[in-house]
A protein has these predicted regions:
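Active-site-adjacent loop/helix segments that line or gate small-molecule/cofactor pockets in enzymes
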Residues: 24-32, 37, 46, 59, ...
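Short acidic-glycine loop/turn motifs at beta-strand connectors
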Residues: 33-41, 67, 74-79, 86, ...
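Conserved phosphate/anionic-ligand binding catalytic regions in large, soluble enzymes, centered on
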Residues: 55-72, 301-305
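Conserved catalytic-core subdomain
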Residues: 1-17, 25-27, 168, 176, ...
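Extended Lys/Arg-rich, glycine-bearing segments that form polyanion-binding/interaction patches
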Residues: 16-19, 86-90, 94-212, 327
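Short glycine-rich loop/turn motifs
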Residues: 28-30, 68, 153-155, 173, ...
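Intrinsically disordered, low-complexity, positively charged segments
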Residues: 1-55, 61
Length: 354
């Protein structure tokens, strides 16, 4: 792919790596590429990061025809920069786009675009412990025309921002509230995609949980309001009587890259992983009879989020004495070890940016 480069006259001042937060500081450049019915994908370019212009009638602003991804670049102790399973993000975006009638952005072009931008932004990949460069590929319709329809033009972009440790105070268990009225996804819908509408629709549940003193909301299935699916914007796993349970990928749950990686590790360590429906009643029962040993969310931003308390209606259970479980800690240490190059990658998950 021929990528045009437009140099920024003055580079931005880089933030203090010890106070990065999440999503606050954008890097110097962004990747942009356009698609039209007539020409397909064209004009790949890396240009100075900054505002973009949109027509008020732009399809995306009215009908939400957009998708996005989330991934990271990591700097190893030796100074190398590496990505983590970027092809999985590319394939997931293809599936998201297909559901929203958006054009396919090929896997090889996706990975090449990410690598090209990260290479240009190498100085922005932080070196402080547990920091990384967050990468946000996204695509949206650019046609200016009202009326619900498949747009005739689209734009694919990538922006980046250095981020600190997701947990500034360390990896600590959180309290989550089971949401039994609102739903995140239904079969036949867009629950398996990474589109903005899914996240906009989840905000009310999050706000309700926070008002009651809970950090996240645990979503139930949209049909029966019975089976556990996701927690906040993360996949979730339960260790019950020595076995792992997590919701199956059946159209309502996002096929997480971290989720898939955790399942690989768990099975490699000899754990039985049940990708099956788990009812909230059985979950709470396990919490009360002592067989619920650990609960943790999984996702790119936090990697793993241990759960110390579950509330369903007026029923409350404490998980593992509100302490981080041994398996939760091992999963976190192993996966982050691979991502930052502290542990040999025997799975072939990391890709060095040269």
């Amino acid at each position: 792919m021929d990528i045009r480069f437009e140099k920024r006259p003055v580079l931005k001042e880089k933030p203090d790596q010890k106070n990065l937060g999440f999503g606050k500081y954008m890097t110097d450049y962004m990747f942009v590429m356009d698609w039209t019915k007539e020409d397909g994908w064209k004009d790949a370019r890396i240009v100075p990061e900054g505002p973009i212009t949109m027509d008020p009638a732009c399809v995306t602003l009215h009908y939400a025809q957009e998708t996005f991804e989330g991934m990271k670049a990591y700097r190893t102790a030796e100074g190398k920069i590496q990505l983590f399973r970027p092809e999985m993000n590319a394939k997931r975006m293809i599936n998201s786009n297909a559901r929203l009638c958006m054009p396919e952005f090929p896997v090889d072009m996706f990975v090449e675009a990410v690598e090209a931008l990260v290479k240009v932004e190498a100085d922005w990949v932080p070196s402080e412990p547990n920091t990384s460069l967050y990468i946000r590929p996204f695509m949206f319709a650019t046609e200016a025309a009202l009326g619900v329809h498949m747009a005739s033009s689209y734009k694919f972009m990538i922006i980046c921002c250095p981020v600190g440790a997701y947990y500034a105070a360390g990896l600590n268990p959180v309290k989550i509230l089971v949401e039994d009225e609102l739903v995140r996804a239904v079969k036949g819908g867009t629950g398996f995609t990474k589109c903005g509408g899914n996240y906009a629709g989840s905000i009310l549940g999050q706000v309700k949980a926070e008002k009651l003193g809970y950090a996240q909301v645990l979503w139930l299935d949209g049909e029966h309001r019975k089976y556990v699916e996701e927690v906040g914007t993360m996949n979730i796993m339960f260790k019950i009587a020595g076995e792992i349970y997590t919701a199956p990928i059946e159209g309502t749950v996002l096929p997480g890259v971290t989720r898939d990686s955790m399942i690989h590790l768990l099975r490699d360590w000899g754990y039985k992983v049940n990708e099956t429906r788990l009812s909230v009643d059985d979950l709470m029962k396990a919490g009360h009879d002592g067989t619920l040993e650990e609960v943790f969310g999984t996702g790119t931003a936090a990697v793993i989020s241990p759960v110390g308390e579950l509330r369903y209606k007026d029923d409350v259970v404490t998980v593992n004495n509100f302490e981080i479980g041994e398996l939760t800690q091992k999963l976190y240490d192993t996966l982050t070890g691979i991502q930052w190059g502290r542990i040999p990658d025997k799975y072939g998950w990391t890709v060095e940016v040269k």
